[in-house]
Amino acid sequence: DAQRRKIDRLLDEANVGPGTRLLEIGTGWGELAIRAAARGADVRSLTLSERQVHLARKRVAAAGMSDRVQIDLRDFRDAGGNYDAVISVEMIEAIGLHAWPEYFRTIDQLLRPDGRFVMQAITMPHDRMLASHKTHTWIQKYIFPAGLIPSTTAISEITSRHTAMRTVNTMSLRADYAETLRLWREQFLQRRRTLSHMGFDEVFSRMWELYLAYSEAGFRSGYLDVYQWTFAREAQQP
C-alpha cells in the first residue's frame, strides 16, 4: 500500500489522467506504468534491464494493460517523441555526475511546453557530494558502480543552467524511507536461509545486511534524504 501511495503521488504531481502521454525513465517492475494506464494514460517505459522488460511486460499483460503500455529496452537519450509528462524514480543516482546535465536536457526536450517532469531522488548535502564524487567507496564497488547521490543544490543549479524547467514543489520522504529500509532488512534476515539456497553466499548476505543498515542510519541521521521533485516550464509554474 505504501508503494502504491508513493506511485499515486508521483502520478498526481505529473497530472497523469485520461489521454496523458507519459514517459517513464526506469521501468522497475512495471507498477507505475500499470497504475498510470489504469488512469487512462498512454505509457512508454524505458529500461536497460532485459529482466525488467520481461517481467514488466508479463505484469502489464496480466493487468490487461498491454494496449496502453509500451516497455522498451532503450537508453533515455534515445527516447524520441514528445510527452505530456515524464516520471523517473531513483534513476539519477545511477548515471553518474557527468551525465546529469544531459539527463535533464534530454527530459526538457522530450516534454511538451505545458508538460511536467516528476522525479524521485535520494540526496546528500552538497559539500559531501563534492567530497565523495572522486572517491571509490565499497557501495560504489559492490552495490552501485559509477553511481553518485546528488545534492538538492546540484539539481537546482543544473536544471537552471541547462533547461527551461523550474521547481514547482518538493516533498521529503526521509522518515518513510528509513522505516522502509528497516523493514527490508528485517525481511532479508528472516529469509536469509532461503537466499542461501538461491546461490547467495554468506559474504553477500553480510554485505547486503550492512548496506541496508548503513542506508537506514543515513536517512535517520539526516545525512541522506529522498525527495519527490516536480518541475514545470517557467511559464507553467503556479
Q: Residue locations for each model-derived region?
A:
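Conserved class I S-adenosyl-L-methionine
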Residues: P18-G26
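Conserved SAM-binding loop of SAM-dependent methyltransferases across substrates and taxa
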Residues: W29-G40
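Conserved SAM-binding motif I beta-strand of class I
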Residues: D42-T47
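Conserved SAM-binding loop
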Residues: A56-R57
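A short acidic, Gly/Pro-enriched loop at the edge of an enzyme's catalytic core
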Residues: R77-I87
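A short glycine-rich, Lys/Arg-flanked "PGG" loop and its adjoining helix->strand segment in the class I
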Residues: P101-P113
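Conserved beta-strand signature within the Rossmann-like core of class I S-adenosyl-L-methionine
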Residues: D114-I122
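Substrate-binding/catalytic lobe of Class I Rossmann-like enzymes that use SAM or dcSAM, i.e.
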Residues: T123-P238
